């Protein structure tokens, strides 16, 4: 699923140890030095058990924990209940294999933790991701080359959306509540800092709550079908009628959400629009349209720019081609 990253692993001259946690014997698992075939939905228990084992091995970085974390004592007390016998029974993984994984992490000078949609869109996703991050933090495996808690995106150009304003108001790595960071982004974009909100946009659950409370009266849904594919479908579907206006912008007009819309905006498909995407090497790839979009369909960004012109903020979009030049200013890993 992520050939660029895995090929980097294969080319590593230091022959790193690769531990794969997956119920399935995938190609990645078969190429790993250690495969932990956990039972579905048991990742969280495994991670807590490994955390307990690392504490027992003295593999915690006390200076890093002291200077850069909070709540470690509470976490250590919590995972103390996850002994190897309990973890093995819950995960179906032999104690010896779990011990091998803990030993490898404890002995590693540079340990990197990677996960993708199997965690982020799986059972107890938030807690499982937090458990992975906790392993990186408690061992000090973060902030140095070859380390890190790395959540790898799952869909094409999902990384692009994160780098360029996944919070709808700031570039990635910036804090919307920090005036200095808002000033920096405004300078890069060449716009008035007052145009940048001082708070992040709303998450899905907050949007649903906003519809229910009446705070949100109109909703514009782009390239997704929450009436079918998102969590708590029954609640969301029941709230759609509470909106004064539902706009759906999508390639398909017959999705469950599109059929409920007051206004449908037909979008161009991937082969019908120019654009770019960003891959795991931070390279920006150029995409050119193979054909014209049919009928009234148009690229999403053209719709956004048109609306911006009508709202009087069109000039803020006219320098969009130069955004990437300043996006990574001050970063050690610039987008190329």
PLM feature segments, named:
Residues 169:
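Expand to "…catalyze enediolate/carbanion chemistry for C-C bond making/breaking, isomerization
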Residues 1-157, 163-164, 181-336:
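Cofactor-pocket helix-loop regions in the catalytic cores of large enzyme subunits
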């Amino acid at each position: 699923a992520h050939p660029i990253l895995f090929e980097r692993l294969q080319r590593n001259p230091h022959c790193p140890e690769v531990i794969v946690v997956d119920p399935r014997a995938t190609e990645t698992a078969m190429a790993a030095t250690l495969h932990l075939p956990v039972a579905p939905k048991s990742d969280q228990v495994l991670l807590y058990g490994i955390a307990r084992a690392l504490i027992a091995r003295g593999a915690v970085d006390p200076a890093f924990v002291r200077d850069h974390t909070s709540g470690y004592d509470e976490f250590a007390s919590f995972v103390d209940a996850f002994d190897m016998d309990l973890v093995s029974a819950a995960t179906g993984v032999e104690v010896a294999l779990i011990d091998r994984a803990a030993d490898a992490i404890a002995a590693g000078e540079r340990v990197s933790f990677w996960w993708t949609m199997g965690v982020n869109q799986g059972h107890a996703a938030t807690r499982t991701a937090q458990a992975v991050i906790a392993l990186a933090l408690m061992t000090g495996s973060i902030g140095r080359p070859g380390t890190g808690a790395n959540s790898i995106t799952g869909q094409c150009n999902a990384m692009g959306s994160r780098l360029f304003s996944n919070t709808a108001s700031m570039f990635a790595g910036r804090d919307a509540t920090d005036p200095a960071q808002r000033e920096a982004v405004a300078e890069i974009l060449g716009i008035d800092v007052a145009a940048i909100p001082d708070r992040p946009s709303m998450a899905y659950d907050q949007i649903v709550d906003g519809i229910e409370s009446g705070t949100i009266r109109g909703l514009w849904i782009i390239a997704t079908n929450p009436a079918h594919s998102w969590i708590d479908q029954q609640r969301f579907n029941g709230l759609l009628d509470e909106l004064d206006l539902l706009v759906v912008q999508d390639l398909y007009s017959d999705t469950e959400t599109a059929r409920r819309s007051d206004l449908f905006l037909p979008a161009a498909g991937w082969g019908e629009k120019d654009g770019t995407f960003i891959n795991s090497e931070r390279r920006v790839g150029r995409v050119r349209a193979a054909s014209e979009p049919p009928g009234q369909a148009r690229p999403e960004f053209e719709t956004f720019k048109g609306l911006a012109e009508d709202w009087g903020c069109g000039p803020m979009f006219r320098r969009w081609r130069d955004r990437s030049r300043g996006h990574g200013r001050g970063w050690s890993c610039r987008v190329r």
